[in-house]
């Protein structure tokens, strides 16, 4: 909640952010803090450890949707007088754009599934190849980490904000 941020309650997303920004203000009182909201993500599979996976932000996790978290971060940061770059709303990362497809096996072999077609198709990291070949790269390489295209969108919004505040 906004109160978590203002009261710096550790253990919550907003509370932790409140603690972090307070510490930055302590150590750099003249500095300007820019908060960037999180972008949408797809199903993430770590290329170095394919057993490390997380589902995309198209589904709530722990009862929370990423869009609601991003909105709360932006609202709390703005109330605290911080500069906000709302990547979630403005960077163009969507469930459809984070990756072009996810290559998964179904009975008849492998198929390139576009969102939302892949959400209920299981990925078995012990026997299937990595599901994001180079041609699957969209706004991210792997459903989580921004690609050149994703970084360009983020950089553009950040540059605009920095021009406004400098």
Language-model region placement:
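Alpha-helical cap/lid subdomain in secreted, periplasmic
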Residues: 1-152, 156-165
